[in-house]
């Protein structure tokens, strides 16, 4: 931007700073709000229109604390500031040595080595002489930035200043994760623009972007974003997992890693990685942005929690003397996660130059999704995957009014997809008997409901499960994969808990018929009368019903209702349906019935071979069912990153590669770490483009290109 006002002579000494104002060419912005938003990622110098002086950095009175003042009379000595949005309308100002213009008391400004609340400034614009000047108020003090000067005997203050944009090379770039892509458009997402119909691209039907709140917020480290940047979003995880990861109870229990180097940005010594995806985020927003450029059109983000596991976290925190988790109440957790997602949307908008300009867009209807996708952006649907979604476990009071109230609350939040049950039975219906953790889930079901799973022999077309039957001799070292890596305090707590659990379990069961429990067990609980009201309520609100994690009997009953009402809004988002057996071609097979209704199926992603193993056997039957009804056949992916599971392992891969949308991808760089799919696999969500390319190549070479085509039709279907 060119300066719109002539410099004036310095009339007095600068005593303090409190408001920033700048002038800009009016052609850059039509409104004052646009003028503010367009400051994102700019390099600027700040000049007083009254005196012509520039802000410089200098030593304070004692020569120790660095300060800023209008002390410069020429452009060459003026401090350069990089304007990094902290939120919509709020900015960090970082100088060339990565210090931040900050205020912790009225009329004082210092150079902070790292950002804090005093480094955040809310900027507003004022139209001046055909351009704009800007006023800045500190978020910490609530005071504006002023230049105080003397005019004769009169002390005056100036609170509107000119800003001159400088070449980006004159500023220190704010640290950030790289996309490492090349496109034909200045804005990479313009490459993804398409028509509102016949959308080409895929859906990830099962993600957990908000999982950092899981288990009270002390299980999964890292954040999708942070107001102060990537250094804070992906910092060392020892605050949650302890020194050497010794307090990472869930990771040590269900992961195959032992203690770990907790270092985050910029070195990322051990995480993110495919195995540490269990308890470390892979959803930093720039990684998700890179994934979008692979053809990811639609993303279902399931808020996720489990009150039993949160309670265990609470007990562990008490034993360790570490910070306690946030509220374990599911409604509270879902609200926090939904708030986080909308805050992320605003943050991405701020980075992109204003409201609605970011690639990440939360949608509530199919029409909204089509509009967002056509604009080259990622459509995001919010869902819930939790065991106590409606607070209707066997230990709680539950009735139709309670269900309706919760459903109304969730819908008003923006939630559009829900698992009616997850992991445990409820008064709504029965859960599928998950493997390989079915026995652990059985213990959780007892804690949550006061009883174990009821079982019955499975239908021949269903893959049954094996359940342990008492008495038990529980060994902590066998229950926890990395028991020996626990800290002494945590190991003692686990020993006490397991000993107590063993006494209870051996007193009250479970006891099963060996003929059923030895590999042919299905949950005997189906859809209850309360569940019928819930399903009809979801249909009335046009919400998506995710049938994964339901017992076979419950899923059949849900399909009966949907068929009777002609409702197509059913999904199986990651293949956890009917005991993971997708190979039945029977016309009454649940997934075939779901497909005939117009429902949608996504399969869990690992290697190409494992994906094919889930999809291929039933692919023809489901495709035929869709075609018979005139539906476009499409099978999405269900990555389930941060669903407490590992991600796709490394496989041979060649860089660079160019996808069908014309986007060229090189190895992804985050800080000092370069990620290579050949070495790292899908270490974080930003490596989804590599996974999809490996699918394309492998499926094409094996003669299964039709499956890849079905994947790329999945967003439309």
Residue locations for each model-derived region?
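Short, Lys/Arg-enriched N-terminal segments with co-localized hydrophobic residues
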Residues: 1-4
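Small-residue packing motifs within transmembrane alpha-helices
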Residues: 8, 12-14
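Bacterial N-terminal signal peptides
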Residues: 14-24
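Sec/Tat signal peptide C-region and signal peptidase I cleavage site
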Residues: 25-29
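Lectin-like carbohydrate-binding module/patch detector with strong preference for beta-trefoil
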Residues: 30-178
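Beta-strand-rich binding-surface signature
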Residues: 80, 379, 542-544
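N-terminal hydrophobic targeting/anchoring segments and the immediately downstream early-domain regions
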Residues: 166-524, 528-536, 553-555, 559-566, ...
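Short catalytic-loop micro-motif centered on adjacent basic/acidic residues
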Residues: 544-547, 602
